[in-house]
C-alpha cells in the first residue's frame, strides 16, 4: 500500500505544556511574563517558546515542537484558556486600577483616551469572565509584586519547578527597573524596534516596548484624566 510523504509530521513526545500570562495593559504583565520565561529556561533550556497570542491564529509556526509554551495575552480566547487547562498548564493574572492603566497607556505609549478606555474595558470584561471560572495565580500592581524578590520564588513554586536561589536572584536582578531600561536601550540600538521606533514598537522575544518602564505611581489617573474621564 502506498503512503503519501507527509509535509508536516506530528512531533514525537508529549504536547507542550501551556503557561498563560494574562493581564491588563500596564499591570506588570510583561515583567511577570519574562520571569516565567527565565525560570522555565533554567529547567528546560531551548525547549521554551514564548510569544504573544490571544488566539490560535496568532501562534508562530513550529510551536508544537516546544517543551513549554509561554503565552502572553490581554484578551485570551476561550479555546486558548481551554488549551492551558488541557495541557495541565498554569495561568497567571496581573491586575491594576483600570484608570491608572489607562493613564499609563496615555503617558507612555501616546494612546488617546477614547481608544485606551475602549481597549481597557474590553480586556477587563474578558479577564472578569476568566477570573470567575478559572483558578489563576493573581498579582496586583498596587502591591508592588515586581519589586519583590520573593515573587520570583512564588512563581517558580506555581510552575512546579525547582530553581536554585542564586538563579532566582540573577533573574530578579536582571528585571529591575534600571536593568530593564538598560535592556530596552540595547534593543533600540540593535534595531529590534525597527528603523524608526515608536510607541507601538516592541521586541518579539521579550515583548518590551521602547517606553515600557513607567514611574510606578499609584493613583496617577488623578493627575492625567479629567474629572469627566475618571467617571467613564
Identify the residue ranges that each predicted region occupies:
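A structural signal for well-ordered alpha-helical segments within the folded catalytic domains
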Residues: 26, 30, 34, 96, ...
Amino acid at each position: 500500500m502506498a503512503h503519501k510523504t507527509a509535509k508536516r509530521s506530528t512531533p514525537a513526545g508529549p504536547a507542550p505544556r501551556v503557561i498563560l500570562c494574562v493581564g491588563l495593559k500596564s499591570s506588570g504583565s510583561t515583567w511577570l511574563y519574562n520571569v516565567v520565561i527565565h525560570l522555565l529556561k533554567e529547567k528546560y533550556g531551548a525547549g521554551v517558546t514564548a510569544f504573544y497570542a490571544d488566539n490560535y491564529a496568532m501562534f508562530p509556526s513550529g510551536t508544537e515542537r516546544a517543551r513549554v509554551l509561554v503565552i502572553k495575552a490581554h484578551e485570551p480566547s476561550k479555546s486558548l484558556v481551554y488549551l492551558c487547562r488541557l495541557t495541565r498548564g498554569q495561568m497567571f493574572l496581573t491586575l491594576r486600577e483600570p484608570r491608572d492603566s489607562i493613564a499609563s497607556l496615555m503617558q507612555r505609549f501616546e494612546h488617546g483616551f477614547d481608544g485606551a478606555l475602549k481597549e481597557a474595558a474590553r480586556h477587563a470584561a474578558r479577564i472578569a469572565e476568566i477570573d470567575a471560572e478559572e483558578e489563576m495565580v493573581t498579582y496586583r500592581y498596587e502591591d508592588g509584586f515586581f519589586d519583590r524578590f520573593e515573587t520570583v520564588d512564588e512563581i517558580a513554586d506555581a510552575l512546579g519547578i525547582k530553581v536554585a536561589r542564586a538563579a532566582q536572584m540573577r533573574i530578579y536582578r536582571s528585571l529591575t527597573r534600571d536593568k530593564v531600561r538598560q535592556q530596552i536601550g540595547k534593543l533600540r540600538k540593535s534595531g529590534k524596534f525597527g528603523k524608526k521606533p515608536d510607541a507601538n514598537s516592541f521586541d518579539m522575544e521579550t515583548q518590551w516596548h521602547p517606553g515600557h518602564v513607567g514611574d510606578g505611581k499609584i493613583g496617577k489617573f488623578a493627575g492625567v484624566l479629567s474629572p469627566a474621564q475618571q467617571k467613564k
